[in-house]
Regions:
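Non-heme Fe(II)/2-oxoglutarate
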Residues: 1-72, 77, 84-89, 117
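Short, Lys/Arg- and Gly-enriched loop/turn segments at beta-strand edges
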Residues: 191-197
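Peripheral, non-catalytic segments flanking oxidoreductase cores
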Residues: 2-11, 15, 216-221, 226-241
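Secondary-structure transition/capping residues
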Residues: 27-28, 191, 219
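Catalytic core of non-heme Fe(II) oxygenases with the double-stranded beta-helix
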Residues: 83-182, 188, 200-234
Length: 241
């Protein structure tokens, strides 16, 4: 995990916000991935995602970042997300069955200390591997009390609310949203969004995310990996500005 400060300028942020404003009608619904432990407050509808299309200003910004931090890498997949539900523990399915290393970068578009990404050290091939692992981990002692210091209510074990899955995972770090900053981590690391839904002043949360590396045909860029949501649209013939 690495936090990169000021990777986006104020002008870059406005480009992404305008990209969403102009094209949000092309966004698709992202549902809850299979295999995520059934915590409290987890719903099927997580967010709406708008793919960042080539030959746009938004794409050029991301392409320059990839070329700077991953020289020689020729593939990335980016999207603008408007989240309506705090994402529970998961890994990014872009890395499922990956032939080589893959990375995720999350970009903050706003200053908001109540918005956080919490990254743990454990690695999984896909979300379907998480629940059986956690069932075994819960048989042993917890290794932290992070659920007492961070907003992680949605990761509580619904069968026993005194237990929180995150307390059985090894923390790597916490990324607090500051406009223009980003966090880089292994796509297959388990991570979670802080439970911002508990604060009534927030109806949604915006971010930009990219995945970098050579993906497997089994990754979620293929429509079969979107669970309980809409298929990813083919943007080839869609006029996006």
């Amino acid at each position: 995990m690495k936090i990169i400060e000021n990777i986006l300028s104020a002008e870059d942020i406005q480009v992404f916000k305008k990209y969403w404003a102009d094209n949000h009608q092309h966004a698709y619904i992202n549902g809850k991935p299979e295999g995520v432990p059934p915590g409290i407050g987890v719903h099927d509808h997580i967010d709406r995602r708008l793919l960042v299309k080539e030959n746009t200003q938004a794409y050029s910004i991301l392409e320059n970042i990839v070329n700077t931090h991953f020289p020689g890498e020729n593939y990335f997949w980016g999207n603008f997300q408007r989240q309506v539900t705090s994402h529970s523990l998961h890994v990014d399915e872009f890395g499922k069955d990956r032939p080589d290393m893959t990375h995720t970068i999350i970009f903050a578009l706003d200053d908001q200390p109540k918005f956080k990404a919490i990254i743990f050290k454990e690695l999984f091939n896909s979300c379907q591997d998480i629940e059986p692992y956690m069932e075994e981990k819960l048989k042993g002692p917890k290794i932290s009390n992070i659920s007492k210091t961070e907003d992680l209510d949605h990761c509580a074990d619904w069968r026993d609310l005194t237990r929180n899955y995150c307390d059985w995972l090894e923390l790597e770090g916490i990324f607090t949203y500051k406009a223009g900053d980003a966090v880089l981590f292994d796509t297959n690391q388990i991570h979670v969004t802080s439970y911002w839904n508990k604060y009534p002043e927030f109806q949604s949360r915006d971010l930009v995310q990219i995945h970098v590396g050579k993906r497997s045909p089994n990754s979620y860029s293929d429509q079969t990996q979107i669970q309980k949501g809409e298929p990813i649209p083919d943007l080839t013939d869609i006029d996006i500005r």
